[in-house]
Amino acid sequence: MEKQIKIALAGNPNCGKTTLFNALTGSNQFVGNWPGVTVEKKEGKLKKHDDVVIMDLPGIYSLSPYTLEEVVARNYLITERPDAILNIIDGTNLERNLYLTTQLTELGIPVVIAINMMDIVRKNGDEINVKELSRELGCEIIEISALKGDGVMDAAEAAIRAAKGTKTVPMHTFSGPVEHAIAHIEEAAVHNMPEEQQRWYAIKIFERDDKVLEKLSIPTETMNHIEEDIKAAETELDDDAESIITNERYIYIAQIIKG
């Protein structure tokens, strides 16, 4: 029997994620709660594909550990490591939705993007250069209308292809000072991890993410060296590390949307 393929469905609240999940799985769903929390956990088998399980993650705006939903989604992605992520984004609100995308592509898990509500985008007379966006983000993009069911199986098939494809290595999208610090952190603290996971952890260490620092328990001496690197970037860019990452994500998104 073929190995089961796990695909995580991720996106902002109200982007059409639940509609897409229902379209992909039909009545073939299991609903429960995530361990230890009251956040609803939904998974289902892809229609006509018994070997493909779709996990509907809670709607989130980012992978920061600030809300229960974010913690649940993030824990699933970094500990369970699904075979692919199907990231549904609302085409009418591209900039805000891509903020999560930039974080998902750092996980070293293959990502496929489903741009939802493309019918409305066109109706509004707007245009999205899907080909250019796909090239910039390094992942396949499928246009869908979750409500009408257009393109939904194409999106699932693309996610299956991505899951069976080669390993993905995250792209470098930050400014020189940040990338310099991240490279040092990778070398100093996370070089023993699988290559595709190193960058995400290094970025989180740069942001001084409490949950990651707690999990990794980096030796004090190493952490002192890392702090020097972080502070150097903060001084050069005149902001705190977490704000620097946030701002640079939005700068990157603005650049790729302009195409």
Segment roles from a protein language model:
Residues 1-66, 79-80:
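Conserved G1/Walker A P-loop phosphate-binding module
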Residues 20-21, 39, 54-56, 73, ...:
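Residue-level signature of catalytic and energy-coupling elements of molecular machines
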Residues 27, 36, 59-60, 91-95, ...:
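Conserved nucleotide-binding/hydrolysis micro-motifs of P-loop NTPases
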Residues 32, 66, 97, 123-126, ...:
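Alpha-helix N-cap/helix-start motif
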Residues 46-49, 72-141:
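Conserved C-terminal guanine-recognition region of P-loop GTPase G domains, centered on the G4
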Residues 69:
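Conserved donor sugar-nucleotide recognition element shared by glycan-biosynthetic enzymes
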Residues 112, 122-259:
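Alpha-helical transmembrane helix bundles of large polytopic membrane transport and channel proteins
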